[in-house]
A protein has these predicted regions:
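Conserved acidic donor-binding segment of nucleotide-sugar-dependent glycosyltransferases
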Residues: 312-314, 318-325, 333-340, 354
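A conserved mid-protein helix/loop that constitutes part of the nucleotide-sugar donor-binding site
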Residues: 17-22, 198, 205-221, 238-244
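Short His-centered aromatic/hydrophobic patch
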Residues: 97-103, 121
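Membrane-proximal helix-turn-helix segments that form the acceptor-binding/catalytic region
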Residues: 84-85, 139-159, 173
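Short hydrophobic beta-strand element within catalytic cores of glycosyltransferases
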Residues: 297-301
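N-terminal strand-loop element at the rim of the active site
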Residues: 5-13, 26-73
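Aromatic "clamp/platform" in nucleotide-sugar-dependent glycosyltransferases that forms part
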Residues: 261, 280
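Carbohydrate-associated surface elements
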Residues: 166, 184
Length: 383
């Protein structure tokens, strides 16, 4: 089977990029498959090794020589021409869009081979509306972006794949071509947490979506009862200076530590005893699966979408209403004060994480591709 993944880049450190590489590598190992990753921007080496993958850089470079809206649409036209030419040379069986810049282009391409077109949704459908809008112009722009995406271009795809049943049920009612496939665990760590260290951990980009400001306030409450525990936040991002200032003004230096970027996320998790997530929204919350895979209990905001799918409240962690910082702190304190409960929840999560192994997810994707191609062929032959 000839499979093409189209995405923005595999050089930028992000969840979509890592998941795309991991899935493509796994599919390339299956006999009879040939896999491509087609990117618009490849300014440096891929963030993960590519194993048996054809990497094609279209050289559009959205992130350089960018001159506003006019420049963006000029690059979109260039992207369309190059992508259409390449796909007509490859003649793939399946084309999967995982990025942002190609998502509205693929349904417009003239592809005589009629490949199966799949759009992967790595964010909850209405994620744009979850952002804190700062002006009327931004509100209008986000609304127009959503209308363009969901009322027009997305209908050109054969199938849309979302990450959770929650997203499908809440946001895609009436759509008969929406399917569910979770993300896989993207790394493996043989070392598991003992849940005995006096450390909690959170991982993610330091951006508005992750709401680490809320987590810092929560930890201020936790510290009042448990000053010997500390919180490590691993990641980089545009809000780093603001978060450092918040930590200093809250008197939490040494209690909350911004650790910076690490490529050894699972190893860092295995040295902690709790995983905490305060995101405003997620597409899936892969980091929760990764934390479970090293035996950590979880405390998470019940944001759309993902945490409700991953966490069984009271079994492998706790779910808390978004913004309820008091209850969140109480749940953290409960786990700090009850080591047997921490370990019990950690082991429950470890067992649950096994169903997200990349080998199993890759086989599920292959079966899905086969079924959808057979269905498309049957429809074509019946005309």
């Amino acid at each position: 089977m000839r499979i093409v993944y189209c995405t923005d880049s595999v050089c930028i450190l992000g969840g979509v990029e890592i998941v795309t590489i991991v899935k493509a590598n796994a599919l390339a190992k299956i006999a009879g498959n040939e896999v491509w990753i087609v990117v618009a921007d490849a300014q440096s080496a891929p963030i993960r090794p590519l194993e048996g993958i054809h990497l094609v850089d279209l050289g559009v470079n959205y992130y350089t020589d960018y001159y506003g809206l006019k420049g963006f649409y000029k690059k979109q036209r260039l992207h369309k021409v190059h992508l259409e030419k390449l796909l007509n040379e490859i003649k793939p069986d399946v084309v999967v869009a995982t990025g942002q810049n190609e998502r509205n282009l693929l349904p417009l391409l003239q592809l005589p081979s009629k490949p199966l077109l799949i759009r992967e949704m790595h964010f909850e459908k209405h994620y744009r509306q979850k952002k804190k809008k700062k002006s009327m112009l931004q509100k209008i722009f986000l609304w127009l972006s959503e209308q363009l995406d969901y009322l027009w271009r997305i209908k050109g795809y054969d199938y849309i794949v979302v990450l959770t049943e929650e997203d499908k049920e809440q946001n895609w009612k009436g759509w008969n071509n929406v399917l569910v496939m979770p993300n896989p665990i993207t790394s493996v760590c043989d070392v598991k947490s003992t849940c005995e260290a006096k450390t909690a951990i959170a991982v993610g980009r330091l951006v508005e979506q992750k709401d680490f400001a809320s987590l810092i306030r929560i930890w201020g409450k936790v510290t009042e009862k448990h000053p010997d525990w500390r919180l490590e936040i691993w990641g980089k991002g545009e809000l780093e200076a603001a978060l450092r200032q918040q930590i200093e003004e809250s008197g939490l230096e040494g209690k909350v530590c911004l650790m910076g970027y690490t490529a050894e996320v699972l190893q860092k998790m295995s040295q902690a005893s709790l995983y905490l997530l305060t995101s405003m929204f997620e597409g899936f919350g892969l980091v929760l699966i990764e934390a479970m895979s090293v035996g950590l209990p979880l405390v998470s905001y019940m944001c759309p979408t993902g945490p409700k799918t991953i966490i069984e409240d009271g079994q492998n962690g706790y779910l808390v209403a978004v913004g309820d910082e008091k209850t969140f702190a109480e749940r953290v304190c409960q786990l700090i004060e009850d080591e047997p409960l921490r370990k019990q929840m950690g082991q429950a999560g470890l067992k649950e994480s096994e169903k997200y192994r990349i080998e199993d997810i890759a086989q599920r994707w292959m079966q899905l591709f086969r079924d959808l191609l057979a269905k498309k062929s049957s429809r074509r032959n019946s005309r």
